[in-house]
Amino acid sequence: INLDLSDPERLKQQLQGHQFLYVVHAAGATKCLNRNDFFSINTDGTRHLADALIALHMPLKRFVFISSLSVFGAVREQQPYTEITEHDTPKPNTAYGQSKLKAEQYLDSIGNDFPYIILRPTGVYGPRERDYFLMAQSVKKHIDFAAGYRQQDITFVYVEDVVQAVFLALDHGRSGRKYFLSDGEVYSSTDFSNLIRRALGNPWMLRIKAPLWVLRLVTWCGEWRARLTGKITALNNDKYNILCQRNWRCDIEPA
């Protein structure tokens, strides 16, 4: 079924006559030309799906929502960096993170009768992922570009590990709980580029570290180019805020 999450009534019609015990809601947008589209897709789409399942009295055992570590934004930015925890106050610094947070808040507002579990993966890599592929292309062309001079701690999770976490949540997740997902390691930007370099056979590489205003200029140009051409780009305002954030550590112990 190709569900239409933008139209609540049509969505209910599409779900009518079906019974689902388990739902994994991974549909969403990570890049949009217009800021409002993040909220139409990520927030409203989640709300429409949850409302439809409730209205149809779907006999759900688990509803797993794929959110993001980005809902927290730049918290715990003072060195030495410590792990972001579920007790921190979210301050998302991207439209994507804000839209995911609003979706989480809507699920929280429904109440205990809706058996939802929220997964918050950090940067996900794997087949068909584009942003990290661009980094690999840059290293392959012998350029390692980093922005900002202050230490940056970054974290990742492989897509297959996210899938495994989904199955664990479906089997054992506690309703109303939120879990961070990462591989448990912390990397510097240099560590990351070195990993890519080794995977590519150790090509020679020129390391360039630029001030953040250079990144601001690049992403500003990318944003305007996207608006003029109508083509979504990875070099946008959200990407600037993501790369400015220095601490991506997260507490995975509850998971």
Each model region followed by its residue ranges:
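NAD(P)H-binding glycine-rich loop region in Rossmannoid oxidoreductase-like domains
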Residues: 5-44, 48, 69-74
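Conserved Rossmann-fold NAD(P)-dependent oxidoreductase catalytic core, especially the SDR/UDP-sugar
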Residues: 48-95
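Flexible, glycine-rich beta-alpha linker
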Residues: 72, 117-134
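Active-site Tyr-X1-5-Lys
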Residues: 91-119
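Substrate-positioning beta->alpha
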Residues: 102, 129-134, 148-170, 176-177
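Mid/C-terminal beta-alpha module of Rossmann-like enzyme folds, strongest
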Residues: 169-235, 252
